Amino acid sequence: MKFHEFGDNHNPHIVLIHGGGNSWWNYLRQARLLSDKYHVILPVLDGHGEEFQKEYVSTEQSAQEILEYIKDQCDGHVFALGGVSLGGQIVMELLSLDAHIADKAIIDGSLCIPQPKLAKMSILLVKCFGKLMFSKAACKMQLKLMKKMYPKMAYPEELENYYLEDMPRLQMKTLITIYNTYMASYQLKPAISDSSAEVLYIYGEKEMKCVKESAKLFQQMHHNCMLYEAKGYNHGYLSTYLPLEWMELVTPFLEREE
């Protein structure tokens, strides 16, 4: 696992964890905007981006690696943790592993209720069409369609280049493992109730029902959690495509005194 850093490392630390299939650049724009006040750390999960040759194991293993980094490089504590989809689930696990690891946490569109049937369908889809879906030609087409159909959410050229570099080298076994762990089997740990972090849990209005149910379950088990429904949006839109809207929502949360 690699880590990209932005800002002065004497400032409060914020760790932002990308979703499955993407890489550190998922939060690149937010990191740059936050870096004048914070030291922002963007991990590259095993099996993703420049770490594509490393085997992705599980949410728990990823959380352990990030926890070790925080112990070694941040004196065991960060100001905030954040993550989208798989990254948000890793945040949940980190909060469960260490009740006082962070003052704040931002989770976006993450599951904590197992969905084995959905995982089986997703794995079947990847096995049948994965190589076609993530070919360079297909990725170029996806970016063109995004510009045409959703210009507000289109990537800038820099992120397009990262996308075209990283997505075609994503191995199908990595996606299958993610579906088997993130989607099919991960359950919220009882220890989450001991976490002292203040949590903002974001989900899109158009998310699947299981994501909304996960948000409600998390709030039931973690009593210092505020839910936010992003009206009109689908899975992970604020974190992945709309960094300015993400900043408008998250900045007051980060700056608010408890």
Q: How would you name each of these model-derived features?
A:
Residues 5-52:
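Conserved HGGG/HGGXW glycine-rich cap/lid loop of the alpha/beta-hydrolase fold
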Residues 41-82:
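Active-site loop/oxyanion-hole signature of alpha/beta-hydrolase fold enzymes
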Residues 83-87, 91:
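Gly/Ala-rich beta-loop-alpha elbow adjacent to hydrolase catalytic centers
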Residues 96, 104-133:
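Flexible "cap/lid" loop of the alpha/beta hydrolase fold
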Residues 116-118, 136-191:
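Conserved alpha/beta-hydrolase catalytic His-Asp/Glu region
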Residues 195, 201-203:
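Short beta-strand/loop motif that positions the catalytic acidic residue
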Residues 208-214:
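Conserved alpha/beta-hydrolase "acid-adjacent" motif
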Residues 233-245:
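Catalytic histidine-centered segment of alpha/beta-hydrolase-like enzymes
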